[in-house]
């Protein structure tokens, strides 16, 4: 059965084992696309792999670090979570469809029961009509018997009157004998009495029949009233069933709308993944440019160091030349007249002060580097603790089989894995890397990337393990539910009670209401199914909200990446401009220093010949002691 582009297999309202397999077995386009993204990193994963293989091996760690910081691993985890949610919703949809089939079957059975009840009502009405006709006939017979009784009584009274007349006329001799007159009258009386006895027996039998018919009529009235009550209940149930069918149709339409929204969200996620890949490629290009800038900076620093060395040698040569000149000038003077000129003393003092200032600057730079390294060490220790806690958290929460444990294990691990992407912006915002040399920056970055990559691989394994353990727990929790019948499963989901309590409640209902057992149970089932459908709709709304939040997070990541790219591009432009200015200044300074050294070398040739004859060490020590005094 296919619903909204997804394939399902249903066996008596229970999902088969094919639903719990890998994503490749499901025949939905969106889910297969997400599974390919999990395995190979999307449709363009092979191109990205060939491109990365063609690059230098020295940048592999940096590429892994950049892909990790840009949230590729959390995106996979989020897509896996969304796929699991979609599978759960599909299973719930298949279960609801199986329950709808069961409801339709129960409705058919109810309609059959209603038809049987209507047939019984027709039969009972026919019986009522027959009994009424019998009662009418018996009433007519009773009326006839009463009329005959009255006639017999009138005949008896007439006979008695005739007897009286006979007794009164006995005095006449002309009359016949009384016996001759009484004999036929007595015979008629006997016949009349026999008929009266027969009529009384018939009357008693008719009374018995009327009583039995009245009892049958009362029973028929009771059955008719119960049938009417059942018919009213059936009408109410049919109305409720129609309302529930309307609600089911509304829920199905909402489910279709939610499926469409889910497809749209999946398409948006794919677009965001494509943008993330493009940004990763742009960051890689920016990384090559940054490496080139670092090479220029290193060369510039080497040239600055060479310039400083040349300046120091030049100053030393000037000092030595001035000392030689003072020695040559003081050769013909006495010990008391030998004095160092003021210019030489000032130059030596300036030179020594410059060297002292350089040493102080070096000490300050070393102190700052030590402080920054200590702070970085503390930050990385805190990050390691957080990663260890995140590794312990999913391993402990993966053993739980409840969906609450799943949500609690997914939440913090996702945040901590995403938190790894904030390491470089925090370090650069503190300004520690700007004061250190580029070589030390590169080494510290490599060390931090290696440590974070190790812990991130551990977190990704923990993510996969947690999802698999959760899938297994879902299978274990769904298997015992499928063993129970439909009534018990629906009652267990809505009421949350034990199966024993449900069995006792069903037995009590069956014992209490023998006549109303079928419609009452069906009404309860329909109410419970409506409750479960509402819960499923609420769960789907919550999953859509979670997907919207995940999409917003991805959009924020994309915005931060674009901003970081713009900031890095601006920094690169400024650094390149500064490098060009410094290189031009270095070239001008080098030209001036070369001309000065040539002039100084020509002037100091004569002085160097005389300085070789004298003891340069003693004169240098004397000059130093005088300068310190």
From Swiss-Prot:
Coiled-coil residues are: 75-375, 544-592
Tree of life domain: Eukaryota
Q: State a single Pfam family of this protein.
A: MAP70
For this entry, list what GO says about its biological process.
cytoskeleton organization
Annotated region Disordered: the residues are 1-54, 391-421, 458-519, 578-629
Q: Which region ranges are annotated with the description Required for targeting to microtubules? A: 257-493
Q: Name one GO cellular component term.
A: microtubule
Q: Basic and acidic residues bias located where? A: 578-596
Q: Which UniProt keywords apply?
A: Coiled coil, Cytoplasm, Cytoskeleton, Microtubule
> Any idea where this protein resides?
Cytoplasm, Cytoskeleton
Q: Name one GO molecular function term.
A: microtubule binding
Compositionally biased region (Polar residues): 13-33, 393-416, 603-613
Q: Which PANTHER family match?
A: MICROTUBULE-ASSOCIATED PROTEIN 70-2 (PTHR31246), MICROTUBULE-ASSOCIATED PROTEIN 70-3 (PTHR31246:SF16)
Q: What family is this protein classified in?
A: Belongs to the MAP70 family.
* Function in brief: Plant-specific protein that interact with microtubules.
The protein, known as: Microtubule-associated protein 70-3
List the lineage, top down. Answer: Eukaryota, Viridiplantae, Streptophyta, Embryophyta, Tracheophyta
Q: Which gene name belongs to this protein?
A: MAP70.3
